[in-house]
Design a protein with these regions (language model features):
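DNA major-groove recognition helix of helix-turn-helix/homeodomain DNA-binding modules
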Residues: 78-96
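Short alpha-helical DNA-recognition segment
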Residues: 49-69
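Residue-level detection of the helix-turn-helix DNA-binding "recognition helix"
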Residues: 61, 72-73, 101
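Helix-turn-helix/winged-helix DNA-binding modules
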Residues: 48, 59, 74-77, 88
Length: 104
């Protein structure tokens, strides 16, 4: 948010902060969320290049709606499923590590 806009809101009595502050997240929780979102974005990019959500779901013995949730960063999706899905699209452990390393 631009500083001028922040000041105007604060002058009108609004409290301005980050999502992490609002949700009272620890730095570790914030980083974990950022990692999951990065994995979700990269999963969607990789999957769109090579297969449908249905095909990926079949490879993982999962469902298409679950893959959609994984690609959209749904909080109910585990990091394990995200990593398994990335591997099923052909990602290497090194590529997955690079995605995680870019967070922060």
């Amino acid at each position: 948010m631009k500083e001028a806009k922040r000041k105007k809101l604060e002058e009108k009595g609004w409290k301005v902060g980050t999502v992490a502050e609002f949700l009272d997240l620890t730095p570790e929780e914030t980083t974990l969320i950022e990692i999951k979102l990065a994995l979700s974005r990269h999963l969607k990019e990789r999957r769109q290049k090579s297969m449908t959500q249905t095909v990926l779901a079949e490879k993982l013995h999962s469902s298409q709606p679950r893959i959609a949730k994984a690609e959209n960063g749904d909080a109910s999706v585990s990091i394990e499923l995200l990593i398994r899905a990335m591997l099923a699209t052909g990602a290497t452990p090194q590529e997955i590590g690079e995605v995680i390393a870019q967070v922060g």
